[in-house]
């Protein structure tokens, strides 16, 4: 160690002296003595590393309190930070999928703040069932005999298979052996459930006779899987749920369906692409239907299974049900969301997912044009700002081919350097509420479809 290095080490302050500095009093009051001391120890270690590697003091040496304040504030930020989603993907999996309705937020808050009748029967003063209230609502909406709630749709599929077909064959069309995010594959789930996959048909064509010929003494289920995250077009043939249900009745084999996204309303009435609805499959005679709570339904993450009472009872009594059951916050949010469907006239206004999906291109474009001049005054020296037409997508594997006409604010660097776009996007990610767009075709695009808090957005962007 050189004498110069020893001199630099000697200039590092003692923790006790820093703690008695008036600048640290407010930090100790806000974050507590223990947390501040732990941080100062780490800062001293960092300072020693800087001295050892560069033979200089750290650049924050002159103001330890300010550096400590910045580090404490950064550490105190929640890992789940609110962001402004201008990616053009409404149900963005990485950004938490469906926004919750105000009614759902209030229901969750109430469920967290007080004991609730999660598994308590007020009439009989005894134990109740946590799915009961939601099952009643779901049966009213879908026409099913009963319902079961778990923590996501992958869990719903696993439970359906394990509880009703473990040790047996499950017949599925080859064209429906889907994989969703995280390498969740139907064949893998079947193995975990103890089922044997029996593929029928080909990738693009499956006929009714394929299912009939596949049935044997060890067949447990006939299964339909909605290919919600991809589409096969051209020379294709599939067996519709109603026809498969008829085959199931003939052969006395239950038919189950995994809808994936699952919409409880006909989206075509809002000018959106039509998506299969659980109530249609129930009416067609399908024994059980599973779907997600946090996609097109617009609620919290949950797996919902509706169907025949006897089969739902098998699910409720299976050991996996306890491992996969939903908690009180999920159930509270889901119940509040489902109640919105009882008032369909107000659904597009009260359900954020539907409200965002049904925004007209004209209203989005008008919003972008209204903000353009003010943003150009802030960013125009470096970037050319234009309002351009674009196509939003629904996201989360819902309606993968369909796009929604929208409008975006685009930023193109005057000097054509892509690094400026990366730097701008990075700068926006450091805002108090990060703004997330996408870089494409030499521009940074901000699709305005999901921008609702316009004043907050502009306040941050203009700083």
From Swiss-Prot:
Keywords carried by this UniProt record: Cytoplasm, Protein biosynthesis, Pyridoxal phosphate, Selenium, Transferase
GO CC annotations, alphabetized: cytoplasm
This protein's pathway: Aminoacyl-tRNA biosynthesis; selenocysteinyl-tRNA(Sec) biosynthesis; selenocysteinyl-tRNA(Sec) from L-seryl-tRNA(Sec) (bacterial route): step 1/1
Claim: Metal-binding is one of the keywords in the record: no
Residues where N6-(pyridoxal phosphate)lysine is found: 295
A GO biological process held by the record: selenocysteine incorporation
EC number: 2.9.1.1
Record field: catalytic activity: L-seryl-tRNA(Sec) + selenophosphate + H(+) = L-selenocysteinyl-tRNA(Sec) + phosphate
Its biological purpose: Converts seryl-tRNA(Sec) to selenocysteinyl-tRNA(Sec) required for selenoprotein biosynthesis.
Similarity comment: Belongs to the SelA family.
Official protein name in the record: L-seryl-tRNA(Sec) selenium transferase
Organism: Salmonella paratyphi B (strain ATCC BAA-1250 / SPB7)
Phylogenetic lineage: Bacteria, Pseudomonadati, Pseudomonadota, Gammaproteobacteria, Enterobacterales
